[in-house]
């Protein structure tokens, strides 16, 4: 016997199936999705949840090698561990938001993937989630295709209901 909540969730699931048929992902993007969420590549350590962001601050080494590096969150908190840390952006609609990173230093999604592939820019506060990836060229392309596929309307995220 289905409860009212079950029916609502089932209807949401059914709509997701319809949307998947209307807006199918390429096989390359699907492989990119598998990489994105894999333990090996680990993009989902920071790009997680419905909006693909953990809303936290991380040091990726972006701009750290410049003559006057941006202090990042440290400028606000004055906590040394926040030096060079910036808030994780969403991956949603990322294909429409170039240039990338807080300083606009990476012009294309391919540049972004290559930055992570190299393990960021080494520095004492580099996030422990950033590691050299050693991706093959086709894997880089697949990751970019997945990120491009994340373009569209934002998901409707309803607040959880407490049991009555």
Where are these regions (language model features)?
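Extracellular low-complexity, Gly/Ser/Thr-rich intrinsically disordered linkers
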Residues: 93, 105-154
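Generic low-polarity alpha-helical segments
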Residues: 1-3, 32-35, 146
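Residue microenvironments linked to proteolytic maturation
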Residues: 1-11
């Amino acid at each position: 016997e289905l409860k009212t909540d079950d029916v609502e969730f089932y209807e949401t699931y059914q709509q997701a199936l319809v949307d998947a048929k209307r807006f199918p992902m390429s096989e390359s993007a699907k492989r990119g999705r598998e990489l994105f969420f894999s333990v090996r590549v680990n993009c989902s350590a920071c790009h997680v949840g419905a909006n693909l962001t953990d809303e936290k601050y991380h040091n990726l080494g972006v701009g750290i090698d410049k003559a006057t590096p941006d202090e990042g969150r440290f400028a606000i908190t004055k906590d040394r561990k926040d030096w060079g840390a910036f808030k994780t952006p969403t991956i949603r609609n990322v294909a429409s938001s170039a240039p990338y990173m807080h300083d606009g230093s990476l012009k294309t999604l391919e540049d972004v993937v290559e930055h992570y592939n190299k393990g960021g820019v080494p520095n004492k506060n580099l996030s422990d989630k950033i590691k050299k990836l050693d991706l093959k060229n086709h894997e880089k392309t697949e990751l970019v295709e997945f990120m491009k596929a994340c373009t569209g309307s934002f998901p409707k995220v309803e607040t959880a209901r407490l049991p009555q």
